[in-house]
Amino acid sequence: MTQLFPGPIVRTPGLAELDARARDIFRRVVESYLETGEPVGSRTISKGGVALSPASIRNTMQDLAQLGLLDAPHTSAGRMPTHAGLRMFVDGFLEVGDVAEQEKRAIEARLAVKGRSFEEALAEASSILSGLAGGAGIVVTPVREGGVKHVEFVPLGGGQVLAVMVFEDGQVENRLMRQAPGVTPSALQEASNFLNARLRGRTLTEARTEMGGELDAARRQLNETAARLVEDGLAAWSGGEGDARSLIVRGQANLLADARAREDIDRVRQLFDDLEQKGQLIGLLDDVRDAEGVRIYIGAETRLFSLSGSSVIAAPYMTGRQKVLGAIGVIGPARLNYARVIPLVDYTARVLGRMMDG
């Protein structure tokens, strides 16, 4: 089920190069660290039923540290796995089970709610993963291939306007925009008519490519308010960049829940900065689109998350005909519960794909 991203450039030993004692102690250290988030001392290992003295365990842990698999924080005599050590553990020791039946039913029920727009369903999938996995849920929306059928601007009051785009395949995308109070119904209708005349039948990518020159025409032909609606609507639907896809992130607050020390707070702040890099994140998840099953990125294996030391677990979601639509996953600290999160991501991606078919 799991296809893994290659390890870091710096060479680390393989499992075959570790003797049985080293493998056993290494596994116990990593499992304890993933459970508690705390460095693991030799006495903790000896209490777990290992028939070795604490001194022998310390010597083995020192050997593992010299191999680049374990490290010691400055404030503790205990050891914790390096990112290379976590990679070895995930590839060689991790036992991945199945999602609990109760959680399967909960995922299916929350994604089966009728009346949602396409993007609202994707946002719900991101929220589901965030809540179950304890990290931030991420989804990259598909590239829209269907043409636009209808565009409308709906006033909501309080300086807010809902931009509604209906596609030929029946999907609907909504964007909430802020406008100066007092936008008139005539300006909303004028902007809608202008876009409908030019966007009908075009994909979002085509619209963004071809509408750049039309904005000047909009400014000449429409009043100032209607022209601004046209410009803001196009920017909102296309994400404001050259890529017509959107990145949906939910559950960032979960990333703060596990922060214990100043170093953890700094790491989370860096991760928040990383999550603002939409283009790089979509580029990373594009690699996931080409994978079979779940991909795992740990810390420095990606340039984007090397400073925050975060991990990404993601999978493509696709139609029953194996057409890849996008990618969905979880971002969190390197000590994510991989055995739990991997099957959650895999199952949610498959349910989401079935829902897109329906």
From Swiss-Prot:
The gene is hrcA. The keyword Transcription regulation applies. Belongs to the HrcA family. It comes from the Bacteria. Pfam families: HrcA. The lineage of its organism: Bacteria, Pseudomonadati, Pseudomonadota, Alphaproteobacteria, Caulobacterales. This is Heat-inducible transcription repressor HrcA. Disulfide bonds: none annotated. It comes from Caulobacter vibrioides (strain NA1000 / CB15N) (Caulobacter crescentus). PANTHER family: HEAT-INDUCIBLE TRANSCRIPTION REPRESSOR HRCA (PTHR34824:SF1).
